[in-house]
UniProtKB/Swiss-Prot annotation:
Family of the protein in this entry: Belongs to the tannase family.
GO function term, MF aspect, one: carboxylic ester hydrolase activity
Residues at the catalytic site: 185, 414, 464
Designated name of the protein: Uncharacterized esterase XCC2094
Positions of Ca(2+) binding: 253, 256, 260, 262
Signal peptide bounds: 1-28
E.C. code: 3.1.1.-
Disulfide bonds: 252-269, 278-286, 529-551
Short name of one Pfam family: Tannase
Classification via InterPro entries: AB_hydrolase_fold (IPR029058), Tannase/feruloyl_esterase (IPR011118)
Length: 576
């Protein structure tokens, strides 16, 4: 018995020594990364971070992180390049995989929250600042610096893919088994760029609310800015948003057989805002004729005033009163008086298109006829601007050939990226299958071929990558946590199952928490169905429970009826 106890003590001692040696070895390995030679790259620091809370350089506090090796570096593939990046590698418990995360808006910083998300899931992870040190709402880095536009467009993504994987392999002494990418908003654009330009880099890609058609999307922002602020008489105050939302829901909410404050498929009901016209004195419950024209223009989206041709899409009216949607992006609020659309549009056009800088830019001088082509073709390092920053290529043949899988999702009430654009992009990929596969003879077959590697989820009631009255808790980068980390509830787990087990995601059960706070309980659950399916209540059982919904096929296309040939013009656009 004494011998047995002694043996146990010896084994425990050896295990403790082994753990210490392992930790010391990992520390040495992390520090050794400083000497790693990478093309056009300098490693600034490589340090071990203990488990627990971590305060990032920007002040972000990330709780409950595992111990990790934090690598900070900068790449300079060209003389005017300054691409910052970070790579975080678990010191123990690595899941053997790599997850790169995307940027936000104009980038300019490291998204530490996204790195923490990936690290907690066991991944080695990396991201970039997009090639500059401004801020997410500042595009001044681009003026007079075509190389920096190129870096922000796709070069920063490319160098971080290369450096991230090299550093992970050097630290762990093995290549990642599977590689994934997850990005939201501009990071969603990064995700599509990865599939289109670098098809061999990732096994699985998740694109959340991607601003894929960036140039045309910018015209949507400018259009709503012109409509909203073109004249004081036409401006819609935030106080009127509840009346607009109520009128839109009154017309359309019950069309999906559940009057629950969420419109499952806005394509099935075209809201007629004329019901809001004031019949007497103006109040917050109605709109004047100029305000009605403003609303109609924002909903319809930008058009060429000469030809009536659609430039891009507008925004949906069914959650406009939800905080963080229209009051932040379109009507403006105390923090952003002119609205986020004005900020993004002015920064983009002033610094990437016209090179005036913000102080010298007059948004009323942008011509919705001639300046669309001017913006698309603006020379950037020998390429048209649109080809550098847009992620609209329908050719995913390389990504498909390497057996890659991709999920794109977007909220139907997104106030930043028009959600119908996601359908148009997806349908362009479906159409491309006809070109890549001559044996396809039916539209249904082209769709089925696309669904083998690429699926689109339209999320009812969700705003820009989170928020809104819809069920937005399904494991998004910036959303509330999923009910469970499994393929039935969590989008990343669903992607892992698709890539690693061949189980394609048919539906994902999303949740809505009270005030989007998991501690306050679940308000409802709802299945997210992959396009062209949508969730339909079976007619019995609680309409707040996902088990009482089925996914059924719906018609395809951004519009189910004929889109208006000529959308109403903002008064400011009419005079140009």
């Amino acid at each position: 018995m004494l011998r047995l106890n002694g043996l146990r003590v010896l084994l425990r001692t050896l295990a403790a020594i082994g753990a210490l040696l392992t930790t010391a070895s990992a520390s040495a390995a992390c520090a050794d990364l400083l000497a790693l030679s990478l093309p056009s790259t300098t490693i600034s620091s490589a340090t071990d971070v203990p488990a627990g809370a971590f305060t990032a350089p920007d002040g972000t506090v990330l709780d409950a992180l595992p111990a990790f090796c934090r690598v900070v570096g900068v790449s300079r593939p060209a003389s005017d390049s300054e691409i910052g990046f970070e790579v975080w590698i678990p010191s123990a418990g690595w899941n053997q995989n790599y997850l790169q995360v995307g940027t936000v808006v104009f980038a300019g910083n490291i998204q530490y929250r996204s790195l923490g998300f990936a690290l907690r899931r066991g991944y080695a992870t990396a991201t970039t600042d997009g090639g500059h040190r401004a801020s997410i709402g500042d595009a001044s880095f681009a003026r007079g610096h075509p190389q920096k536009i190129l870096d922000w467009g796709y070069q920063a993504l490319a160098t971080t893919i290369s450096n991230g994987k090299a550093l992970v392999s050097a630290y762990t002494h093995r290549a990642p088994h599977y590689s994934y990418f997850f990005g939201a908003s501009n990071g969603g654009r990064d995700a599509l760029i990865a599939a289109q330009r670098f098809p061999g880099a990732f096994d699985g890609i998740i694109a959340d609310a991607p601003s894929s058609a960036w140039v045309h999307n910018a015209f949507s922002w400018l259009w709503s800015q012109d409509a909203q602020f073109g004249s004081p008489a036409a401006t819609i105050s935030a106080a009127k948003l509840p009346a607009i939302q109520a009128a839109a829901l009154a017309q359309c909410d019950a069309k999906d057989h559940t009057a629950d404050g969420v419109v499952n498929d806005p394509r099935r009901c075209r809201f007629d805002p004329r019901v809001l016209l004031c019949s007497g004195a103006e109040s917050d419950a109605c709109l004047t004729a100029p305000q009605l024209q403003t609303l109609a223009a924002i909903l319809a989206g930008p058009v060429n005033p000469r030809t009536g041709e659609r430039i891009y899409y507008g925004f949906e009216p069914f959650a406009v009163a939800t905080p963080g949607t229209w009051n932040q992006w379109i009507t403006g609020n105390a923090a952003v008086p002119g609205g986020g659309h004005a900020v993004l549009a002015n920064q983009f056009f002033a610094n990437m298109v016209f090179d005036t800088g913000s102080a010298g830019f007059d948004h009323t001088q942008v011509n919705f006829d001639t300046d669309v082509a001017r913006a698309e073709r603006k020379p950037v390092a020998g390429q048209p601007l649109a080809s550098v920053i847009d992620a609209t290529s329908a050719d995913l043949s390389g990504f498909r050939a390497r057996n890659g899988k991709m999920i794109l999702y977007i909220g139907w009430e997104d106030p930043v990226v028009p959600p119908r654009g996601a359908i148009t992009y997806y349908e362009s990929v479906v159409a491309r299958q006809w070109l890549d596969n001559p044996q396809i003879s039916r539209a249904e077959d082209a769709l089925a071929q696309t669904q083998q590697f690429f699926r689109l989820f339209m999320v009812p009631g969700m705003g820009h990558f989170t928020g809104g009255p819809g069920t937005s808790a399904f494991g998004a980068l910036y959303g509330p946590p999923a009910l469970a980390i499994d393929r039935q509830h969590d989008v990343l787990a669903a992607m892992e199952a698709w890539v690693e087990q061949g189980i394609a995601p048919e539906r994902i059960v999303a949740a809505k928490y009270a005030n989007d706070d998991p501690a306050k309980g679940v308000v409802r659950t709802r299945p997210l169905c992959h396009y062209p399916q949508s969730a339909v209540w079976i007619g019995q059982g609680s309409a707040e429970d996902a088990q009482n919904f089925i996914c059924v096929d719906s018609p395809r296309g951004a519009y189910l009826d004929a889109a208006p040939a000529r959308a109403p013009l903002p008064s400011s656009a009419q005079s140009r």
